[in-house]
Regions:
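Conserved AMP-binding/adenylate-forming core of the ANL superfamily
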Residues: 13, 17, 26, 34-79, ...
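Conserved S/T- and glycine-rich ATP-binding loop of Class I adenylate-forming
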Residues: 72, 89, 196, 202-205, ...
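Conserved AMP-binding loop of ANL adenylate-forming enzymes
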Residues: 74, 229-254
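Hydrophobic alpha-helical segments in the ANL/AMP-binding
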Residues: 25-26, 62, 80-99, 109, ...
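Structural core segment of the AMP-binding/adenylate-forming
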Residues: 92-169, 173
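Short hydrophobic segments within beta-strands
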Residues: 75, 120-121, 199, 241
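Conserved pre-ATP/AMP-binding loop-to-beta segment of ANL
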Residues: 16, 33-34, 166-201, 208, ...
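Flexible, non-catalytic linker and terminal segments flanking ANL/adenylate-forming cores
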Residues: 1-18
Length: 254
């Protein structure tokens, strides 16, 4: 039997409720710009850097010619970058399927096919797998799969403290003008909270994962449940031990 004191209404009322994730990100980027949005072993990313990288990657996706509602897949090891990628897809108005970093070729192929992905957003190497070589093999059997995106071309792994988006080629801050240009390019593309935003890959009963369709409201509702059940405040620092971007890692980590 678990006995705990129910959180007081005043405590719950003090925790913001958001209409979408972008509202939360923009709020913390404005009010806590240098505080950490995400922390990983290699480094930490501030709220401002997180917000800027999301816009830059969303603009990059848009520049590739993907229409709103296009389907993509995210195959990126857990860490700051995968969270940027998920938010960037929503900001760019494309539907993403999350693929676990430990997935083998058969599972990746299955999820790309089931998710009808036209684009694979990934990193050059996952474990011992050269993702470019794998992409070339997969596209031979998946005619819809046409684009390979190296996320590190836009969003590098943070080393130490990152307080602003950096140019991966030079290591220098990209600057406000580049971010403003990215925001202008993606204006009006954001996926509405009540429309399909992602396909969550999770364990199936046939030896291959299944895909569960979600809109953005699933995060907002889960946030409310977590705040209410745990009497959480805005001072909490949350540790996720469930890998993203799939399964319960989507519920707890992002």
């Amino acid at each position: 039997v678990i006995d705990y004191e129910l959180p007081r209404a005043a405590t719950l009322a003090a925790v913001p409720r958001w209409n979408n994730l972008d509202e939360a990100i923009a709020h913390w980027a404005a009010t806590k710009p240098t505080e950490s949005a995400y922390v990983e072993p290699a480094g930490r990313m501030s709220w401002v850097a997180y917000d800027q990288y999301i816009s830059l990657l969303a603009a990059h996706i848009t520049e590739l010619g993907l229409e709103r509602g296009a389907h993509v897949a995210i195959w990126i090891p857990d860490g700051c970058v995968v969270h940027v990628a998920m938010s960037a897809c929503i900001r760019a108005g494309v539907v993403f399927t999350g693929i676990g970093a430990r997935s083998g070729e058969r599972e990746v192929r299955h999820l790309l096919a089931r998710g009808e992905a036209t684009t694979l957003i990934t990193v050059p190497q996952i474990g011992r797998v050269d993702t470019v070589e794998l992409f070339e093999r997969l596209r031979a059997d998946l005619p819809a799969l046409r684009r390979y995106v190296d996320v590190y071309d836009v969003v590098p792994v943070p080393h130490g403290r990152v307080d602003a988006a950096l140019d991966p080629a030079t290591g220098a801050p990209v600057g406000a003008a580049a971010v403003a240009s990215a925001n202008q390019l993606i204006a009006g593309r954001r996926t509405p909270t009540d429309e399909l935003a992602l396909l969550n890959s999770t364990s199936g009963t046939t030896g291959l994962p299944k895909c569960v369709a979600h809109d953005e409201r699933r995060w907002l509702k889960y946030h409310d449940y977590a705040v209410d059940a745990g009497a959480l405040t805005t001072d909490e620092v949350c540790m996720s031990v469930v890998p993203a971007p799939f399964g319960f890692g989507l519920w707890t980590a992002h």
